């Protein structure tokens, strides 16, 4: 069976699962102090690229790729191009991509959120872009602190994010199922997607 056919068959189940999921009224776990108690990505919130608060519970029932991005990195073109391609081919199957700009690595994302949004538009980005954040240190966004300590979110040689375009694969229940290093291109994730749709 082709992946496209599988996606069409599973789409109604994904939508029903998202609507029937328990705990939709739960409180967000977005503070700097209580992130350790979270059980899924869906308990967090983040500001989108336009500064609006987004409850990540909206991704319940979807498979997500969460990545830190930068516009002036040597890996920018290949990552943006492949992420746009993955999103175009699998969004209908239930894939969502969450891109978090970050300036912590070589100061390669120096622009404002508006400038980053304009840059991403040059790649015809249709996936969700968030406001610029830190992914390491005390000021790291709580979601990123949480993802790094999950059993399948830990890194090689420590849990810190090593560079731009570290990617986390998150299942429909909001659990981290795999971490991909910055040198792994997004197309590598494609082989893992069918298990989680």
Swiss-Prot record:
Pfam families: GSHPx (PF00255). InterPro entries: Glutathione_peroxidase, GPX_AS, GPX_CS, Thioredoxin-like_sf. Essential antioxidant peroxidase that directly reduces phospholipid hydroperoxide even if they are incorporated in membranes and lipoproteins. Can also reduce fatty acid hydroperoxide, cholesterol hydroperoxide and thymine hydroperoxide. Plays a key role in protecting cells from oxidative damage by preventing membrane lipid peroxidation. Required to prevent cells from ferroptosis, a non-apoptotic cell death resulting from an iron-dependent accumulation of lipid reactive oxygen species. Expressed in testis. Also expressed in liver, lung, kidney and spinal cord. Keywords: Cytoplasm, Developmental protein, Lipid metabolism, Mitochondrion, Oxidoreductase, Peroxidase, Phosphoprotein, Selenocysteine, Transit peptide. Belongs to the glutathione peroxidase family. Monomer. Has a tendency to form higher mass oligomers. Interacts with FUNDC1; this interaction promotes GPX4 recruitment into mitochondria through TOM/TIM complex where it is degraded by mitophagy. Its EC number is 1.11.1.12, 1.11.1.9. The gene is GPX4. It comes from the Eukaryota. It is an enzyme of class 1 (oxidoreductase). The keyword Repeat does not apply. SUPFAM superfamilies: Thioredoxin-like (SSF52833). This is Phospholipid hydroperoxide glutathione peroxidase. The active site is at residue 73. CDD domains: GSH_Peroxidase. GO terms for molecular function: glutathione peroxidase activity; identical protein binding; phospholipid-hydroperoxide glutathione peroxidase activity. It catalyses: a hydroperoxy polyunsaturated fatty acid + 2 glutathione = a hydroxy polyunsaturated fatty acid + glutathione disulfide + H2O; 2 glutathione + H2O2 = glutathione disulfide + 2 H2O; tert-butyl hydroperoxide + 2 glutathione = tert-butanol + glutathione disulfide + H2O; cumene hydroperoxide + 2 glutathione = 2-phenylpropan-2-ol + glutathione disulfide + H2O. One of its GO terms (biological process) is lipoxygenase pathway. One of its GO terms (cellular component) is cytosol. The modification Phosphoserine is found at residue 40.
């Amino acid at each position: 069976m082709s992946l496209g056919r599988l996606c069409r068959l599973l789409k109604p189940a994904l939508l029903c699962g998202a609507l029937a999921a328990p705990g939709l009224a739960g409180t967000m776990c977005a503070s700097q102090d209580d992130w350790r108690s979270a059980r899924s990505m869906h308990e967090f919130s983040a500001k989108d690229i336009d500064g609006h608060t987004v409850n990540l519970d909206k991704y319940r029932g979807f498979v997500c790729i969460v990545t830190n991005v930068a516009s002036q990195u040597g890996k920018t073109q290949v990552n943006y191009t492949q992420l746009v391609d993955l999103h175009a081919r699998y969004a209908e199957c239930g894939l969502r991509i969450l891109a978090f700009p970050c300036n912590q690595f070589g100061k390669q994302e120096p622009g404002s959120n508006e400038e980053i949004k304009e840059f991403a538009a040059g790649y015809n980005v249709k996936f969700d872009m968030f406001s610029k954040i830190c992914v390491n240190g005390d000021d790291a966004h709580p979601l990123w602190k949480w993802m790094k300590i999950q059993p399948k979110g830990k890194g090689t040689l420590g849990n810190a994010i090593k560079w731009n375009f570290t990617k986390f694969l998150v299942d429909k229940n909001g659990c981290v199922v795999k971490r991909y290093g910055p040198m792994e291109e997004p197309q590598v994730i494609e082989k893992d997607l069918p298990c989680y749709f």
